[in-house]
From Swiss-Prot:
Ranges of Polar residues composition bias in the record: 225-243
Gene Ontology cellular component annotations, sorted alphabetically: cytoplasm; nucleus
UniProt free text on domains: The DUSP and ubiquitin-like 1 domains promote ubiquitin release and thus enhance USB4 catalytic activity. However, these domains do not bind ubiquitin.
Family the entry assigns: Belongs to the peptidase C19 family. USP4 subfamily.
Tissue note: Expressed in hippocampus and striatum (at protein level).
MF term (GO), any: metal ion binding
Chain intervals for the UniProt region annotation (Necessary for interaction with SART3): 27-216
Organismal lineage: Eukaryota, Metazoa, Chordata, Craniata, Vertebrata
Residues annotated as catalytic: C311, H879
Subunit structure: Interacts with RB1 (both dephosphorylated and hypophosphorylated forms). Interacts with RBL1 and RBL2. Interacts with ADORA2A (via cytoplasmic C-terminus); the interaction is direct. Interacts with SART3; recruits USP4 to its substrate PRPF3.
Post-translational modification: Phosphorylated at Ser-445 by PKB/AKT1 in response to EGF stimulus, promoting its ability deubiquitinate RHEB. Monoubiquitinated by TRIM21. Ubiquitination does not lead to its proteasomal degradation. Autodeubiquitinated.
Protein name: Ubiquitin carboxyl-terminal hydrolase 4
Any one GO biological process: protein deubiquitination
């Protein structure tokens, strides 16, 4: 097999580096095509050409050759080449422009059978345009009006137009080009809106993941099957469209081969007019086909439909919806008089209007659930990071909504310029009052009234002792959690004894530890000396990385498959050994080519062999010994040229490390991978495929496999080892492949045994009990603890006239009516992400924050919990829900997208709690004033006994006991 399968001659590594380097800085342009490449392959290519200045070691070595582009690690299904969910840019894949892709493809080729992963650049944002590559296409459900139960799943780019969808649907449902059609957007089970603007993009139309679209062909008599429904329900004109002058179907649309049964069907009775949504982006008609709603739905108990990974948005919205002062403000239409359409920092009032419309729907008492489609569309226009359908952070969205509502509703029309002032020894009360008044001169809205408090920040210079005190507003408290110090890892230990299966262990290691810590922990459980272990990352049947003992464990992500190999101590005779990576490959004939291909399979091995006086025969015996467990017995006599019994020791850890050191000092340019030297001895080595024999030697026997010297990925051959009459000279950077033909592998290789492993008792034993739950007060104390600024984040001291690593301390000066507490559960580095699942115990009633407020003249700050945003799962994946207290009946409910169920207080405190909403007790609290009359309620609402008793409870101070 040649080194890659590119169609053009490959230039030298310096030229490759220069040409690709210039292209990788290409700016994203709307409509341009970019390609995804598995980051592991791309990193290997960068090492090969010395792309990064800090990684120039062994540039151009054959052993680093990346081979053909291989994206198999990105697919959840190799056959359909469906992308895995939640892939992360730079971590899992890299994006390259078309010209860069074409060069790499010409130089290296692509793994046979793989199609390029090409995606469009789409533009987001209304005022500030933001381009990004649309990695995940939008899945739409398509059906024909006459048969709504047969739904086809089809993928489109958000840059595709409505006309593109219509043309694709004509093709799928065999609708003649001359027959007129109408396209309907079906959502909320039985609500339909007509898509009339053919030039609108999918993004403009606000279509979301899993959206159902219905195509309606015109009847032969010129009428429409839905004409009666439309005439009864819609006052807006509709626009029928034909097929003339339509653009061709998008190359980015692809249809799933499977039919998906959909139980929803059109109900022709009980229609009512739902009106046309504000900013409907081309929806010219809208109507519902559902039964009249029940008059007994409790206002506020309205679920939110998941539009495709939008549970994070639903969770945040449910918490805000159940924030009484804010919801009352919108339901009373107080926002209409305060919309600031001219604020350059605002969104022309459109976020406020979209939010108001959604809140009115949720509190109308008419619907059990609604789809926040138009609100999401508006958010995506102003905040492109939320425009897609990947999982996002509910707290980040919450911060955007609060900031957006504030700017849209800011009562200040012209913000004055105010010079920031330092305390300069003045009393805190004076400086704080000045800071708050200045803040209100520029920021005056219902959000400031409800959510804003004041921090006190103290900086002390370590050199001159200058003290700087400032007061800054905040909208929510982000509280750190005590970081865990340990990490649990699951690894496979591969014993040196070839008869023993790999054993899976669960070990506890320091969170910021080294590979040596992993080996020590594994040694305690296995009894194998840590110095005899080699830790590897196995990926796609090859070694992605072989770790050194001093490397950090942070390089290993939870998704990596870690195999630890036992390497024996130095043999008694003192001979020097080297340890070689060995890959299993199956040789396949390619009808379209005269050269053969090879496919990796199975788990790779580390095999130790003598460094000197190594023959092909002794190498074959060493490998046969190592894989003896995989070989089906009995073997035919023709294969028995050497016994498959374990004999010699399988290697030396000491020489493994020593060889690395030796190779570091070899002179540059010297061949390091495969050399042969003449030997005066009679060697048994030779071409393993030959069956001829020497004149006086024993008859040669058939071999199970042949050897190839390959690159470190196993994807490109460097040399064969057919070296009759010569000794092999290999080194520790050599990589071998043992190549099986398909028939021999099928007959004699035990696939099941090669994949088998045992589980150590550590896998079944309960994990070490985590630290008991921490109290919320511990998080607050951690937040207010003095810290020293890092060397990369210094403070400029006005006295010393230079940057200093000052000490910094936060304190709380004043707290708002609604206190939003963000528990900082997520942490990450460049290699992996982590979530802290620690249970934080927070009071549901009577949270006393007074002791944490440094203004001793302040009012009491006692709060009751009103909502919680929950996150289940790991960072970047998982699911968001919410608990919230309905202010009309005083009961707790659990909101899970469109589902709403009754909950109890003892369910609320869990390890999933992420964002907490507290409402302050005071004379202005809605619980002691006349409640607003909500639509759908009986003119007012009676407070539950629990609410009436709430004001009489004794406030308690948080206690860790």
């Amino acid at each position: 097999m040649a080194e890659g399968r590119g169609t053009h001659e490959r230039p030298d590594v310096e030229t490759q580096k220069t040409e690709l380097g210039a292209l990788m800085g290409t700016t994203l342009q709307r409509g341009a095509q970019w390609y995804l490449i598995d980051s592991r392959w791309f990193k290997q290519w960068k090492k090969y050409v010395g792309f990064d200045s800090w990684d120039m070691y062994n540039v151009g070595e054959h052993n680093l050759f990346p081979g053909p582009i291989d994206n198999s690690g990105l697919f959840s299904d190799p056959e359909s080449q469906t992308l895995k969910e939640h892939l992360i840019d730079e971590l899992d894949y890299v994006l390259v422009p078309t010209e860069a892709w074409n060069k790499l493809l010409n130089w290296y080729g692509c793994v046979e059978g793989q199609q390029p992963i090409v995606r469009k650049v789409v533009e987001h944002g209304l005022f500030v345009k933001h381009c990004k590559v649309e990695v995940y296409l939008l899945e739409l459900k398509l059906c024909e009006n006459s048969d709504p139960t047969n739904v086809l799943s089809c993928h489109f780019s958000k840059a595709d137009t409505i006309a593109t969808i219509e043309k694709e649907m004509r093709k799928l449902f065999n609708i003649p080009a001359e027959r007129e059609t109408r396209l309907w957007n079906k959502y909320m089970s039985n609500t339909y809106e007509q898509l009339s603007k053919l030039d609108n993009t999918i993004q403009d139309a606000g279509l979301y993941q899993g959206q159902v679209l219905v195509i309606e062909p015109q009847n032969e008599d010129g009428t429409w099957p839905r004409q009666t429904l439309q005439s009864k329900s819609s006052t807006a004109p509709s626009r029928n469209f034909t097929t003339s002058s339509k653009p061709s179907a998008s190359p980015y649309s692809s249809m799933s081969a499977s039919l998906i049964a959909n139980g929803d069907s059109t109900n022709s009775s009980g229609m009512h007019n739902s009106g046309v949504s504000r900013g409907g982006a081309g929806f010219s008609a809208s109507y519902n086909c559902q039964e009249p709603p029940s008059p007994h739905i409790q206002p506020g108990l309205c679920g939110l439909g998941n539009l495709g990974n939008t549970c994070f948005m639903n969770s945040a919205l449910q918490c805000l919806s159940n924030t009484g002062p804010l919801t009352e403000y919108f339901l009373k239409d107080e926002y209409e008089a305060e919309i600031n359409r001219d604020n350059p920092l605002g969104m022309k009032g459109e976020i406020a209007e979209a939010y108001a419309e959604l809140i009115k729907q949720m509190w109308s008492g008419r619907d059990t659930h609604v789809a926040p489609r138009m609100f999401k569309t508006q958010v995506g226009r102003f905040a492109p990071q939320f425009s897609g359908y990947q999982q996002q952070d509910s707290q980040e969205l919450l911060a955007f909504i609060l900031d957006g509502l504030h700017e849209d509703l800011n009562r200040v029309k012209k913000k004055p310029y105010l010079e920031p002032k330092d305390a300069n020894g003045r009393p805190d009360a004076v400086v704080a009052k000045e800071a708050w008044e200045n803040h209100r001169l520029r920021n005056d809205s219902v959000i400031v009234d409800t959510f804003h408090g004041l921090f006190k920040s103290t900086l002390v210079c370590p050199e001159c002792a200058k003290v700087s005190v400032t007061f800054d507003p905040f909208c929510y408290l982000t509280l750190p959690l005590p970081l865990k110090k340990d990490r649990i890892m699951e690894v496979f230990l591969v014993p040196a004894d070839p008869h023993c299966r790999p054993i899976q262990y669960r070990v506890t290691v320091p969170l910021m530890g080294a590979i040596s810590d992993l080996c020590e922990a594994l040694s305690k459980l296995s009894g194998i000396a840590a110095e005899n272990m080699v830790v590897t990352d196995v990926y796609n049947h090859r070694f992605h990385k072989i770790f050194q003992m001093d490397e950090g464990l942070s390089h290993i992500t939870p998704r990596d498959d870690i195999f630890v190999y036992e390497i024996c101590t130095t043999p008694m005779d003192g001979s020097e050994y080297i340890t070689l990576p060995v890959y299993f490959r199956e040789k396949k004939s390619r009808p379209s080519s005269t050269s053969s291909g090879a496919v990796l399979y199975g788990q790779p091995l580390l095999v130790s062999v003598p460094k000197h006086r190594l023959t092909l025969e002794s190498l074959y015996q060493a490998v046969c010994e190592r894989i003896s467990r995989y070989i089906k017995q009995p073997l035919p006599e023709e294969f028995l040229s050497s016994p498959l019994e374990p004999g010699a020791c399988n290697g030396s850890r000491g020489s493994y490390e020593g060889d690395e050191e030796e190779m570091d000092h070899q002179e540059e340019g010297k061949e390091q991978l495969s050399e042969v030297e003449e030997s005066g001895e009679d060697s048994q080595g030779g071409d393993p495929t030959e069956t001829t024999q020497k004149a006086k030697g024993p008859p040669r026997h058939k071999r199970l496999f042949t050897f190839s010297l390959v690159n470190s990925c196993g994807t490109a051959d460097i040399n064969s080892l057919a070296t009759d009459g010569k000794l092999l000279k290999l080194n520790s950077r050599s990589t071998l492949a043992i190549d099986w033909d398909s028939e021999t592998r099928s007959l004699y290789f035990d696939e099941q045994e090669s994949e088998a492993c045992e589980k150590h008792t550590s896998m079944s034993q309960p994990q070490k009990k985590k630290k008991a739950a921490i109290a919320l007060r511990e998080c607050i104390e951690l937040f207010t603890t003095m810290e020293t600024l890092g060397e990369h984040d210094p403070w400029y001291c006005p006295t010393c006239k230079k940057h200093q690593q000052a000490t910094k301390k936060f304190d709380l000066w004043s707290l708002p009516k609604i206190l939003v507490v963000h528990l900082k559960r997520f942490s990450y580095n460049r290699y992996w992400r982590d979530k802290l699942d620690t249970v934080v115990e927070f009071p549901v009633r009577a949270l006393n924050m007074s002791e944490f407020v440094c203004d001793r003249a302040a009012r009491p700050y006692v709060y009751d919990l009103i909502a919680v945003s929950n996150h289940y799962g790991a960072m970047g994946v998982g699911h968001y829900t919410a608990y919230a207290k309905n202010r009309l009946n005083g009961k707790w409910y659990y909101f899970d997208d469109s589902s709403v169920s009754l909950a109890s207080e003892d369910q609320i405190v869990t390890k999933a709690a992420y964002v907490l909403f507290y409402q302050r007790r005071d004379d202005e609290c809605p619980s002691t004033s006349s409640p607003v009359s909500f639509p759908g309620s009986d003119g007012g609402a009676k407070l539950s006994s629990s609410q009436q008793d709430l004001g009489e409870e004794e406030a308690y101070t948080m206690d860790t006991n």
